[in-house]
Curated annotation (Swiss-Prot):
Keywords: Antiviral defense. It comes from the Archaea. The aCascade complex was purified from strain P1. GO terms for biological process: defense response to virus. CRISPR (clustered regularly interspaced short palindromic repeat) is an adaptive immune system that provides protection against mobile genetic elements (viruses, transposable elements and conjugative plasmids). CRISPR clusters contain spacers, sequences complementary to antecedent mobile elements, and target invading nucleic acids. CRISPR clusters are transcribed and processed into CRISPR RNA (crRNA). This is Putative CRISPR-associated protein SSO1401.
Amino acid sequence: MVFKINLPPEGLFARSLVISELLGLNNVGISIDNDVVNIERKEEFKDNLKNELSQFKLVFNKLKTYKKNYANEVNLAEKVFNGDVEEFFKEDKEEYFLPLIFPEIMEAEKWFGGWSGSGKGSKRTIGVNRQSFILSLLSLGKYQLVSYRAAKEQVTVLALVDTTVMSDMCKPSKKKELRVQSNLIAQLSHISRLLIFSTILDEQGCQEVLLLKEGTHRAEIYERNSHTSLRPLIRFWTLVDDDSVERRITSLANQSPDSLNKVSNYIFEGIRGTLSPVEVAYMIARETYLKEEQSPLTSWDVKKIREALERMRVEMEEVYSST
């Protein structure tokens, strides 16, 4: 028997969370038809759900701090996360409200905005069904890349399915955990952050990277990096195809954020084609191991970077020659 889940409306952050969680499950027979998700294998879905609930209690623990104003939500989540999976499948007409950590996106096309205010009367919440509520919690835990402080605000980085390019074939994932010290991420440039984040994404994931900023009375998505913009960086790491290079690039971020910022710019210019692969290799070498003996990067790393850029250039030439 097919189990159906009604998705949150278009334009809500919760919709992207729910879709990401569902597409990331294995062998449950998911298809999406407008605002309805059809799950063909309910028992396999239930087994997947139990496994996810045991791994991602991080966001539920955070949600408990809202219990004063969101008792129904916290009580439901507590039952499900403590093993009562049947609660997830119950049908009811009640809406479960998502507090500030789940901002509504007021401009769906741009994915910017969020509710502000200090009380429920100031419309700081949105309502979804119980299935979407639980799946949103799981997704926030599963696809969180890192969380760090920037000035007085907490920044959470998420890698969710980009619903503008989404299909039922997308398989979002995190290949590994991010190895950069969270207290150093704020020192990295925009390009450096994306280069590092791309090391843990997969080409089949259709994922975008969102930065969620939480203040005292407001949560908002203040930066969105679409899958289309990330695809060249993800492809670059696929062609590098060497975990040791990724580790040493990450070590460079931990040792010298300024140096990584320069290296990232060179790689980005190589991807864009404004620098040749040989020029990129020379400039990275000059900035790292030729300049500083203790630099984590080696001539092997620079060789792998140059070769990946050369292969990207060949791929692009093949694309242009076929059009």
